[in-house]
């Protein structure tokens, strides 16, 4: 086998709770970073948690690895650790052509969720002076280049005052930078589907 490192992990049986599966792949991701892996191939096998299928497993592996190789280093010194894993390959066997297509989509979905988790981590890890309302707004608006279905509406203090958002504005009154509020809409579902709203 042409691999610099081979990691053998004691697997789980189908009765193991979901958090045990997540913890196992989190450990694999962290080990990949510590070994400074650039390419990582994982063979999850055919055993899945009870009431889950192989597509759930593939999505979970992609999501968990992507979101756990993340290391924040932007404002740290040059010697700080940085993530090294650039490529993940999930190895499967015995899939029909249609199942393989579904498996690839599951991997893409997992990777996308992992990227979203990493974006939230990144914004949360930024120091306050690197994460002001204007900076966050700029970063979010930049995402519309990659996601054309993403729509951003911004409101300044005067507009929020007219909407009666006094409680919101009272929180930011002592800040040096004026408050901003964004409404972010992603309309990727069907027109008759109920929307999902997150407030925070």
Positions of predicted regions on the chain:
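Short amphipathic alpha-helical segment within the helicase RecA-like ATPase core
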Residues: 1-199
């Amino acid at each position: 086998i042409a691999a610099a490192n081979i990691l053998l992990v004691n697997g789980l049986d189908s009765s193991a709770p979901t958090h045990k599966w997540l913890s196992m792949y989190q450990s694999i991701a962290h080990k990949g970073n510590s070994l400074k892996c650039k390419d990582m191939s994982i063979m999850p096998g055919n055993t899945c948690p009870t009431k889950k299928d192989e597509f759930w497993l593939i999505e979970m592996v992609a999501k968990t690895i992507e979101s756990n190789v993340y290391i924040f280093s932007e404002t740290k010194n040059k010697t700080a650790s940085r993530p090294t894993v650039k490529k993940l390959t999930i190895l499967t066997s015995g899939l029909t052509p249609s199942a393989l297509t579904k498996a690839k989509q599951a991997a893409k979905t997992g990777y996308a969720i992992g990227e979203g988790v990493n974006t939230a981590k990144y914004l949360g890890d930024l120091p306050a002076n690197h994460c002001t309302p204007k900076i966050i707004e700029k970063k979010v608006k930049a995402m519309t280049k990659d996601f054309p279905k993403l729509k951003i509406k911004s409101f300044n203090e005067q507009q929020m005052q007219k909407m009666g958002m006094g409680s919101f504005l009272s929180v930011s009154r002592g800040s040096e930078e004026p408050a901003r509020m964004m409404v972010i809409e992603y309309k990727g579902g069907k027109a008759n589907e109920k929307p999902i709203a997150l407030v925070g």
